[in-house]
Amino acid sequence: MTKAPQLPDGLVVVVKSDCPTCVVVQPVIDRLGAHVVSEDDDAGLETSYLLDVDTVPTLIRVVDGVEVERTVGWRRPEWERISGTEGLGEDLPPYRPGCGARAVDPAFSSELAVRFGGSRMRSRRVELAELEDEMEALFDRGWTDGLPVVPPTEARVLRMLEGTTRSPDDVVAVVPPDLVECTVEKVAINAVLAGCKPEYLPVVLAAVEAACTDEFNMHGLLATTWFSGPLVVVNGPIAREIGMNSGINAMGQGNRANATIGRALQLVVRNVGGGRPGEVDRATLGNPGKYTFCFAEDEDGSPFPPLSTMHGLDAGADAVTLFAGAGVQGVVDQLSRTPESLALSLAAALRVVAHPKLAIAFDAMLVLSPEHGRVFREAEWDRDRLLAELGELLTLPGAEL
């Protein structure tokens, strides 16, 4: 880490021009003859960062080149005590809060951390030629899913890591098919590539952990010739906090969180684990959901408890559920007004998933639209009753299998 610059003995004030408090205390600063560090220029911004200033104005007293004490904002008693000068700013109120320092502004802090903070990222750096197009370079190196990605600069990755309290060196999972240890830092890099915001990172980390369990069997999902890929359903308050879509077009395009969280998972599997099409990924045709397939459950509008409660979690817990999804198959029933009738339509559609005679060879996730969900809510059917009804309707004679 770059050392803080040597400060002159006496009083030092860190300010910025667009802070109203800094403006009103300027006559006080002039009276004290303090050394001014302005965040408006690069040198001052560097000094502010290295002095760990988070609020301006910050008044610092320096003795023999060493900081002795400081105060932030405008507090007349504190300024008078530190400076040893009475009667400061008598035309000002005794107290006025300061402003957030530019050095801690997310627009600057990540770049400052790269330049002066002694960042110790472990991932290999890739240097590009001056005239090399960074977007094309990522395509050329095979680090994309076929769509453009966001170049993962060190500043962007550090900003992404601010979305979690976990250490960048923590191993999140061993990613198939190459069984490579994947750290929080590696997940963050791929989250940047995917276009995630830092607040999405906890969901991406959870999805990566879930995908790399033996129960989910990501290696098997890659190796199959079937259409399927990982589908992510998000439950809990975090879905709303990060702006996920659980309503109209929830499985489609248009929502950044839905699109980039699922994409980040796929990029981790591809770039860290080596799960690339034509290699271990043997899908004959694939499906568009292998770019990204992620949405939130509409917990408020659902006739049933959250999906996550089926796996032992309490309602209201933040959670991700993964499923090997092969694509979307619609169910049309605009006539049923009873749950029994609607269950018949659902069962008929479920029976033909993949092939009507292969009843136990394929799984399905049933996602109800609000209109169909309302039928079960008004009849007070719970999830268990619907599952039992579907089980009865899908029990077939052996001759039909």
What are these regions (language model features)?
Residues 33-46, 55:
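Thiol-based oxidoreductase modules, predominantly thioredoxin-like and allied folds used
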Residues 51-60:
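Structural micro-motif
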Residues 62-103:
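Non-catalytic, surface beta->alpha helical segment in thiol-disulfide oxidoreductase systems
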Residues 113-401:
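Non-transmembrane, aqueous-exposed alpha-helical and coiled segments at domain scale
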Residues 5-20, 29:
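Short active-site neighborhood of thiol/selenol oxidoreductases, capturing the structured segment around
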Residues 89-122, 129:
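Iron-sulfur (Fe-S) cluster-binding modules
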